[in-house]
Amino acid sequence: MARLFSPRPPPSEDLFYETYYSLSQQYPLLLLLLGIVLCALAALLAVAWASGRELTSDPSFLTTVLCALGGFSLLLGLASREQRLQRWTRPLSGLVWVALLALGHAFLFTGGVVSAWDQVSYFLFVIFTAYAMLPLGMRDAAVAGLASSLSHLLVLGLYLGPQPDSRPALLPQLAANAVLFLCGNVAGVYHKALMERALRATFREALSSLHSRRRLDTEKKHQEHLLLSILPAYLAREMKAEIMARLQAGQGSRPESTNNFHSLYVKRHQGVSVLYADIVGFTRLASECSPKELVLMLNELFGKFDQIAKEHECMRIKILGDCYYCVSGLPLSLPDHAINCVRMGLDMCRAIRKLRAATGVDINMRVGVHSGSVLCGVIGLQKWQYDVWSHDVTLANHMEAGGVPGRVHITGATLALLAGAYAVEDAGMEHRDPYLRELGEPTYLVIDPRAEEEDEKGTAGGLLSSLEGLKMRPSLLMTRYLESWGAAKPFAHLSHGDSPVSTSTPLPEKTLASFSTQWSLDRSRTPRGLDDELDTGDAKFFQVIEQLNSQKQWKQSKDFNPLTLYFREKEMEKEYRLSAIPAFKYYEACTFLVFLSNFIIQMLVTNRPPALAITYSITFLLFLLILFVCFSEDLMRCVLKGPKMLHWLPALSGLVATRPGLRIALGTATILLVFAMAITSLFFFPTSSDCPFQAPNVSSMISNLSWELPGSLPLISVPYSMHCCTLGFLSCSLFLHMSFELKLLLLLLWLAASCSLFLHSHAWLSECLIVRLYLGPLDSRPGVLKEPKLMGAISFFIFFFTLLVLARQNEYYCRLDFLWKKKLRQEREETETMENLTRLLLENVLPAHVAPQFIGQNRRNEDLYHQSYECVCVLFASVPDFKEFYSESNINHEGLECLRLLNEIIADFDELLSKPKFSGVEKIKTIGSTYMAATGLNATSGQDAQQDAERSCSHLGTMVEFAVALGSKLDVINKHSFNNFRLRVGLNHGPVVAGVIGAQKPQYDIWGNTVNVASRMESTGVLGKIQVTEETAWALQSLGYTCYSRGVIKVKGKGQLCTYFLNTDLTRTGPPSATLG
C-alpha cells in the first residue's frame, strides 16, 4: 500500500509517462465526467417537470441546478483545451472536485426534509470518480475520496444529531453510510491501482517496442551494409532469401531444393573490363613489418584503391595478398568501361609513385587490363565473395603478370574501346608470360601524359624524404606516410552512432525534454516545427505516443474496429479472447468485499429477518467456494504438507486463469450474486393487503388516506437497498478484463431490473417512506431530490453511463496492451532473426571468433583488427583439371554450366565445415578452382607459446583429415558427373598475420611467408597428392602420419626446397615412419 500512495519519482521517463497519461486517459475522462454531470443536471430538470412539479414552486432547487449548469459548463470550457489542462492539471481537477462536493451539499438541504440517506449515491459517485476519472495522483485521489466521505458524515451527523426524532436511527444509518463510502474508496483505489498498473505496463511495452523497432532498423541497416559489402545490390535480394532459408532450416544447412544442385547465383555480362594490379616489391617490405604495420599498410593502400575505383566507376572484386583486381561495367553496363579501368590503373600507378617519392621505399605497381565478357556472382555456401570467371578474366590476370612496373598493360580489345583517348606503345614482351606468348596477340603499354611532370616535381621531395628516412625502417616510414591517407576502418559503421539500442536503453534527455515542451504547446500547430527539432527516432516516439492516446479509439484504426474494438484480424481476436488473466482472482476478491459491504449495510438498516440471514449464509458459502477455486494455488503454497489426494487443487486456479469460458461463468455468477443480494431485503418486507400505494389499489389511493402504516415496517432500508444496487453497479467495473459486450449486457440487465423494482413493483415502498417522513397527503410531497425512487433511478442511469464509459476505455487499454505485447514479441523475434542474419553475414566475411570484435561490444574504431599467430596450418587445394574442363560455348551457355559444376564442388567442400570435427577449420577464400583454408586461427594470442610444440601443432592433423575429406567429396562428385577431377593439395604451417582490411568491402585474410609457401606447395604439387614442406612433414610425423620425400624442387621466389608427400592411404600410426629423415 505504501507504494500506492508514495509520491512519484521525478525521472524524466516518469515525466514522459505523466504526460502520456494525461493525454491518453485523463483528458477524455475528465471531459466525459463533466458531460455526464451536465446531462444529469438537465435530467433533474426534466424529471421534475415530467413528474408534474412546478419548477417555480421550488426556487432553491431551480437556482441550485441552474447555477450548477452554468458552473460546470464553464469548467467544461476550461478543460476543453488540452494544453491548458496539462499546465493546470491539479488546480483544475481540484476545482472540479470542489464543485461536485459543493453541489452535493447543496442537494442535501434542497427540496424537503434532510435524512441520513440523502445523496449517499451522489457522494459515492463523487468518491469513485475522484479515483477513476479525475486527473489526480493516487494520494490526491485518496484525500479527495476520504474528504468527500467525511464531509457527508460530519455534516449530517452535526445537523441531525441534535434532533430527537432522528436520533434513534441516526447511528446505524451513519454507520451504513460509512461502510458504503469505505467500499467506494476501496473500489476506487483498486480500480485506479489496476488501471495505472495496466497503463504503465502498456507504456513500457510501447517504449520497449520503440527500442526494439530502433534496434530492428539498426540491424536491418547493418545486415544491408554487410550484404552489400559482399555482393552487388542486384544479387543481394536473392542471397538474403537464401540466408533466411538457411536460418529457418538450421544454421549451416541448406534448404531443401526441388533439384539435386545447390543454388547458383552467377550471371553472364558482356562489355566489361577487368583490371588486375600487383604491388611489386611488397613481399620484401611485408617481411620487415610488424603485424600492426602490415595490416595498417594494406588497409591504407587498398582503401586508397577503393576510393580510386569509386571515382572511376569500378568495382573491386577481391584482394589476393597484395594483388588487387576490379571490373568496370558491373553490375550496370557502362559504355566507357575500358576508359574507366585504364584511368584507374594510371591513378593507382600515380599513387604508388607519390608514395615511393615521399618515402623512398622501392615499391611499384604493375597493372593489366583486358576487356570482354565475364561470368559474375558467388559460389559455395560459406565466405561468399563476389567474383568473376571467364577466359577474359584469365587473360587480364596474365596481362598483369606480363606487364611492366609502373605501367598499365592492355590488350588489343581494350585498345579498340579506348578510341584514341590515350597514346600507347607496343609492349613487345609476350616472352615474359607463357600464356601471352601462346596467345600470340600484340599487347600495349598506355602512356601516362602526366608521368613526366610528376617525376620532375617529385625528385627533390623523394631525395629529401629518403635522407630523413635513413634513421627509420622503410616499413615504419611507409606506415607513417600511409596514415595520412586516412582510409576508413573496416565495419566503422558498426562501432558507433547506429549501434543497436537495447530494450533497456533510456530515451535521450533531448527527446524527453522536447516531449514535455512540445506537448505543452498547442497541438493544433503544424508538426513541421516538431519534426525540425527531432531526429527520426524521436519522431517515431511521438507517433507511438499518439497511438497510445485513448481518443484514437474513436478514430479510424488499422488494428481495431472503431465501433466494437474487435481486432480486425480474426486470429488476433481469437488469441486475445483465449489469453490468460492471472489477476482474475483479485477481481473476485474485491467483488467479495462489495458483497460483504452490502451484507453489513443490510444488517445495520433492516430488522434482520431470519430468511435474509439464511439467504446471505448460502450466498456467502457460494462466494467462499468461488474464492477457494480462484486461490487454491496460493492456499496450497501456505500448506507445505498436505494429503496427496489434494495435490490437484492448484490446477483449479490455473484453469480459471487460462480458460475464458470458466472465467466468464464465474465472473457473471459473482456479479449476479452481488446484484441479487442487494435487493433481497425488498422481498422480506411485511406488507398489508390494503396498502393504498400497491398497484391494485392505486385507484383508491386518494380516498384511503386514513390507512395507517405498520409501525414495524423498516422503510428506512428502502433507500439503502438502492445504494446497495449502486454498489452492485460498481462490482462490474472491478473486472477489468471482462469483455465490453458482457459488461454492457450485465449493466443493462441490472439497470432494467433496478428501475423495474423501484419504479414499478416496489414503488409503493418509496411512497410509504414519503408519507411517513412528511406525515401528510401526497399533494405535499417533497422535491425531486428527496424522492427516493426518482433519485434512485437517476443514480442508476448516472452510474450506468459512467461505468459504460470506463468499461469501454478499460476494454481499449486491455486490447492495446495485448496488441503492444504481441507487436513487441514479433519485433523481438524479427530482431533476433535480423541479429542472426547479421551474425551469419558477418561470419561470411569474418571467422566466428573475429566477428565479436566488430559487433556487439561497441568496439572503439581507432585500431584495425590484427592478430599474429605462431603456428597456423594453411591449405591450398585446387582442381587443376577444371581449367581444361572449362569452356565457353553455346552448349554450356558460355561457361555457365561449367561454373555450376564448380559451384557444386566448392559447396560440397563448404558442407564439410559444418561438421564438428572440422570446427577448427576456417575457410579463407576461393581463387578460381582453388580452395584456401587454415587451422589454428581460433587460438588466443600467446597461447601457442604457453603450450608444448606437439600440442600447439595438433590442429595440423585436423587439416590433413580435412584435405582427405575434400578428396573424398571430389570422388563423389566425379562419380555423379562422370568426370575424373583430381585434387592437388599444398600444406604448410608456421607463423602468420591475420587481419581485416578494406572499408568498402571488408575482407579477412592472412599473410606471411607461411601462406606464400603453402601456395607454392600447391602450385608445384602433383595431382592426387598432398605436398608439404620439410618442417611440416616433421610435425605431421610427430602426430603419427607418414610422409615420404619428393626431393629438392625449384620454388618460385624461394629457391630450392626439399618437399614431401603425405601418405594419405595411411591413418595415424604409433611409431614414426622411417621414410622421413
From Swiss-Prot:
Keywords linked to the UniProt accession: ATP-binding, cAMP biosynthesis, Cell membrane, Cytoplasm, Glycoprotein, Lyase, Magnesium, Membrane, Metal-binding, Nucleotide-binding, Phosphoprotein, Repeat, Transmembrane, Transmembrane helix
Ranges facing Extracellular side: 688-714
Annotated positions of the Phosphothreonine modification: T536
Principal EC category: lyase
Tissue: Detected in the zona glomerulosa and the zona fasciculata in the adrenal gland (at protein level).
Glycosylation sites: N697, N704
Cellular compartments annotated: Cell membrane; Cytoplasm
Protein residues bound to Mg(2+) 1: D278, D322
Residues that hold Mg(2+) 2 according to the record: D278, I279, D322
Predominant location: membrane
Needed cofactors: Mg(2+); Mn(2+)
Transmembrane segments: 29-50, 61-80, 94-117, 120-138, 141-162, 170-190, 586-607, 611-633, 664-687, 715-736, 744-764, 791-807
Activity control note: Activated by forskolin. Insensitive to calcium/calmodulin. Stimulated by GNAS and by the G-protein beta and gamma subunit complex.
Cofactor note: Binds 2 magnesium ions per subunit. Is also active with manganese (in vitro).
GO CC terms: cytoplasm; dendrite; membrane; plasma membrane
InterPro entries: A/G_cyclase, A/G_cyclase_CS, AC_N, Adcy, Adcy_conserved_dom, Nucleotide_cyclase
Record's protein name: Adenylate cyclase type 4
UniProt source species: Homo sapiens
